[in-house]
């Protein structure tokens, strides 16, 4: 069951009810709190474009608590973050795994954060293939190219060498918030005194 809280806002013109995500959007906050698929990506991309159209100078805040998901859907979000004019601050709450960690690293340099108990997990892309040998070979080549592209971007975003990224993403690699900072996936760990 998916419950979405409603908030009531009172102004001099009366009361208005919002779902919590629409209310947060008014403050330029986007929440990525699920696995990443095409529907989630379309929603995030639409919100990013909307906020850019509203004000192309003000930062956008993308909160991430995601196990990851579709690589192509994730690239749609990543490319939009890189394309739009406003800086996107990324904040990991809970877990940013797989494509979630990739999007965490996609934030504006100096504006990528994690809460103290957040976890980040990086690994190579997952895929599967079935069918004739030729189709399996095509799928295998595609996932290898995708891995190469992801590793190249992660190396650019973190300052790590491609060789280190390849080694560190060969299997699931879990990092604490402090380790993610040391690795270059984020810039700072938010502390309670940062409120």
Curated annotation (Swiss-Prot):
GO terms for biological process: protein quality control for misfolded or incompletely synthesized proteins. It comes from Staphylococcus haemolyticus (strain JCSC1435). One of its GO terms (cellular component) is endopeptidase Clp complex. PANTHER family: ATP-DEPENDENT CLP PROTEASE PROTEOLYTIC SUBUNIT (PTHR10381:SF70). Belongs to the peptidase S14 family. Its EC number is 3.4.21.92. HAMAP family: ClpP. CDD domains: S14_ClpP_2. One of its GO terms (molecular function) is ATP-dependent peptidase activity. The active site is at 98 (nucleophile), 123. This is ATP-dependent Clp protease proteolytic subunit. It is found in: Cytoplasm. It catalyses: Hydrolysis of proteins to small peptides in the presence of ATP and magnesium. alpha-casein is the usual test substrate. In the absence of ATP, only oligopeptides shorter than five residues are hydrolyzed (such as succinyl-Leu-Tyr-|-NHMec, and Leu-Tyr-Leu-|-Tyr-Trp, in which cleavage of the -Tyr-|-Leu- and -Tyr-|-Trp bonds also occurs). NCBIfam families: clpP (TIGR00493), PRK00277.1 (NF001368), PRK12553.1 (NF009205). Keywords: Cytoplasm, Hydrolase, Protease, Serine protease. Fourteen ClpP subunits assemble into 2 heptameric rings which stack back to back to give a disk-like structure with a central cavity, resembling the structure of eukaryotic proteasomes. InterPro entries: ClpP (IPR001907), ClpP/crotonase-like_dom_sf (IPR029045), ClpP/TepA (IPR023562), ClpP_His_AS (IPR033135), ClpP_Ser_AS (IPR018215). Cleaves peptides in various proteins in a process that requires ATP hydrolysis. Has a chymotrypsin-like activity. Plays a major role in the degradation of misfolded proteins. It is an enzyme of class 3 (hydrolase).
């Amino acid at each position: 069951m998916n419950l979405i809280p409603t908030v009531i806002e009172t102004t001099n013109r009366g009361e208005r009810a919002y779902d919590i995500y629409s209310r947060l959007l008014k403050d330029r906050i986007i929440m990525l709190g699920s696995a990443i698929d095409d529907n989630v990506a379309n929603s995030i991309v639409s919100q990013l474009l909307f906020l850019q159209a509203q004000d192309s100078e003000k930062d956008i805040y993308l909160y991430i608590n995601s196990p990851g998901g579709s690589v192509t859907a994730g690239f749609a979000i990543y490319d939009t973050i890189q394309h739009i004019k406003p800086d996107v601050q990324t904040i990991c709450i809970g877990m940013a795994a797989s494509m979630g960690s990739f999007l965490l690293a996609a934030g504006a340099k100096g504006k990528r954060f994690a809460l103290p108990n957040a976890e980040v997990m990086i690994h190579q892309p997952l895929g599967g293939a079935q069918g004739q040998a030729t189709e399996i070979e095509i799928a295998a080549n595609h996932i290898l190219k995708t891995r190469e592209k992801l590793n190249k971007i992660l190396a650019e975003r973190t300052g790590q060498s491609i060789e280190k990224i390849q080694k560190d993403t060969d299997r699931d690699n879990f990092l604490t918030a402090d380790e993610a900072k040391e690795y270059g996936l984020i810039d700072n760990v938010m502390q309670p005194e940062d409120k």
